[in-house]
Amino acid sequence: MLRQGEAMSNIRANLLLVDDQSLILTCLSELLSDNGYGVRCARDGFFALAEIRKEIPDLIVSDLNMPGMSGFELLSVVRRRFPSIPVIAMSSQFSGGELPPGVAADAFYEKGVNPGFLLEMLEDITNLKTSRLVDQRRLSVPIWIPTNGHDPGGEPYVMVICSECLRTFPQILGGGSGPIHHTDCLHCHNPIQYAIVHSSVAA
């Protein structure tokens, strides 16, 4: 891990590493530091946002399944607020190299596979910073929101905040099978994608 006072000119990029497992943070931060990255660590999404407030990183690598604010929520917030930051999502709960549905990231790293793949991904996504891609990122990311209970008729619902007019409205949850839900703002009719936060996500 980068030590205070080390020469900044040798750093390839400043990276924020987010995971709730201390062993993962230690192993990956050492790997990334040895390969020229300046690394800061956070143990969940809330701590990651605090680190971003201190200094915006060049890259983010985040676990998905974490207590507090999950990686699903964190990456959705990052994609909307800081769409120019390249992001790699990682998890042991999904296999293969395809992004899991609803994950706002540029690449996916499966935990436990060759860490050299992660280094290759970091090299690749640093070339994605174009204004056209930034616009596409911001438009495609779903909002991750918790359920708010049940209406008088017993139907589960969520409170959705429109990113265009910033007004809030209730939305009854239908029986769709996919992870991403679609609706239009009741006020300005802006199309909105959202996904549901489950409080009992496995660590």
Describe each PLM feature range.
Residues R43-F47, S70-E73:
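Acidic catalytic/metal-coordinating carboxylates
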Residues S22-R40:
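Two-component/phosphorelay signaling modules centered on CheY-like receiver
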Residues I88-M90:
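Hydrophobic/aromatic residues positioned on beta-strands within the core alpha/beta folds
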Residues D19, D63:
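Active-site residues of response regulator receiver
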Residues L139-A203:
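C-terminal output/effector regions of signal-responsive regulators
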Residues M66:
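Receiver (REC) domain active-site loop signature in two-component systems and cognate sites
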Residues E73, S92-E120, T130, V134:
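Alpha4 helix (beta4-alpha4-beta5 surface) of REC/receiver domains from two-component response regulators
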Residues E55-V61:
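Active-site beta3 strand of CheY-like receiver
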